[in-house]
Amino acid sequence: MSGFDDLGIYYSDSFGGEQPVGDDGQAKKSQLKKRFREFLRQYRVGTDRTGFTFKYRDELKRHYNLGEYWIEVEMEDLASFDEDLADYLYKQPTEHLQLLEEAAQEVADEVTRPRPAGEETIQEIQVMLRSDANPANIRSLKSEQMSHLVKIPGIIIAATAVRAKATKISIQCRSCRNTIGNIAVRPGLEGYAMPRKCNTEQAGRPKCPLDPYFIIPDKCKCVDFQTLKLQESPDAVPHGELPRHMQLYCDRYLCDKVVPGNRVTIMGIYSIRKSGKTSTKGRDRVGVGIRSSYIRVVGIQVDTEGTGRSAAGAITPQEEEEFRRLSAKPDIYETVAKSIAPSIYGSSDIKKAIACLLFGGSRKRLPDGLTRRGDVNLLMLGDPGTAKSQLLKFVERCSPIGVYTSGKGSSAAGLTASVMRDPVSRNFIMEGGAMVLADGGVVCIDEFDKMREDDRVAIHEAMEQQTISIAKAGITTTLNSRCSVLAAANSVYGRWDDTKGEENIDFMPTILSRFDMIFIVKDEHNEQRDMTLAKHVMNVHLSARTQSSSVEGEIDLNTLKKYIAYCRAKCGPRLSAESAEKLKNRYILMRSGARDHERETEKRSSIPITVRQLEAIVRISESLGKMKLQPFATETDVEEALRLFQVSTLDAAMSGSLSGVEGFTTQEDQEMLSRIEKQLKRRFAIGSQVSEHSIIQDFLKQKYPEHAIHKVLHLMMRRGEIQHRLQRKVLYRIK
């Protein structure tokens, strides 16, 4: 309790010229309290046919009997009962909320009589407010809104521990022991200014010294309070600017309502407090009237629901009807896939996989309390210039909750969570990173291969268990990170080298098995495809400024975003019995196929086929069912999920040594290529040159296939060991 004696924490609440309340003011307050009491007692819902129910009276009684001394009042109900009352509460919430709480206490006293023995004294009631008005933005808060009710959306990124704050204090003079009791302390982060002088005058006693008063902790009345840090939503931040923050003050039953990572909408009073200690030097006197702002919270709505999904915002019945029509289309899967990044040509399978990732499977809670993730993770590996980053950028815009980050610019703490010291209390607090903020959405990680190995290991738990466990600086806790991961990476050699096989992939099997689908994207040379691609790119550049009509069958971005949010909120399909049986048989075949391949090549694949991959196919099937708003994933969905898995992960696993258009390279072919290379290096020394035609003829005489000779020459040129000279007729060895 020694903290109460520290005089430095009490701030003056005398900012602004408040007038003393006279008889008129007291009469007006009594009148307003009476009207608030009538509202709580008489407001009713229902019609003549169905019968009326007294909404707030019944709610007060129910809450009070359960030992929950709070009630939530809707501003729209208050406005329909008495518009002036609602206006007073909007314009001057600090004093009128106090009157509303006193009125609620009086009504609770009436409706809960007779109370059991020992509970005769009525408890104080906390009134929370909620409103359906359009929310403002942290950036739009100006001095005009000071001391008004505001509604702000955002993400909670930090929360302090719950502490006690005095609401009524008793002070005593050190010298003459004069006690002043029951002094009300203003709510919020403002404190109380202790009197400088003791006014007690006793004959024959010296005057009391300056600052004689101290607080008697035992006679103080305290409530719980907690401060939160709110960051504005990523979609509200203008491009190129940092997200802004706002400090929140919660008390009583509003404490411990939210955790870092929750998306919330706050109803609160925009308030000010003294901004730290200012130095007495001349240059700082200009800051005397400057106050820092915070919001005193009077209501919290958590927008991320229990399953970690973004609640489908305000969807109108017309939109719902449109979504139902859309889901009933037989080609909805193709339509959604075409609507993903329409400016990027081709990559149809990758777009279909991204569609599955956006909709996601169903999260399951098992009877023993464990959970199975429903989110799909996707990795794109391959050549530069294959529109990987463009797809990631589109997904960030298209997902209801999307966070984009680049591998090199992301640390383990930035992706998961960091522990830092609170500048006010000097205690350690925790701030959530990208994967916590994207709870219920998608994290896009570009340049995944450029990340440090230590940072990549940090997201192992987040990808499979969908939690982030922290044990730092005395804080041991677990945060939710129920999000999909879409990652893009390049090959070790920059471009994909077909002869190197698995050496192209520089990832551990532990991280690869956490991805449901792994696509190897190659920039293949094909004249017809190159021509079509060039035409498409030219059209995109030429019609960039013109507002062209959407391609046939496409859904516009806003509709797609709302449709994804709607499907994720409303639908959680499961596998049907027939599709489960089919999937079981196919999985056994896949395992045996991968095992045979490993036996043939005498080396283990770095992309394993495990039970995780079986669960991956289940998730992909469920996401296809969710796209159509179906309760069960059918056999057709399982077929498509298996096909997607086949063209992505299975092909990548089997391509231990793919040799382009020639198909699989066996161990013998690999040995033959290495024999040709050794002979070639023996043929001519470093710094010498030989005719290319004569070398090819010599090897052909030794019965080596021509394509193998050309492949070895091509590889040695890419590695910079030989180069062409004299109009590409002569080969010159550099190293």
From Swiss-Prot:
A motif (Arginine finger) lies at residues 513-516. PROSITE patterns: MCM_1, MCM_2. Keywords: ATP-binding, Cell cycle, Chromosome, DNA replication, DNA-binding, Helicase, Hydrolase, Nucleotide-binding, Nucleus. The keyword Transport does not apply. It catalyses: ATP + H2O = ADP + phosphate + H(+). Its EC number is 3.6.4.12. This is DNA replication licensing factor mcm5. The gene is mcm5.
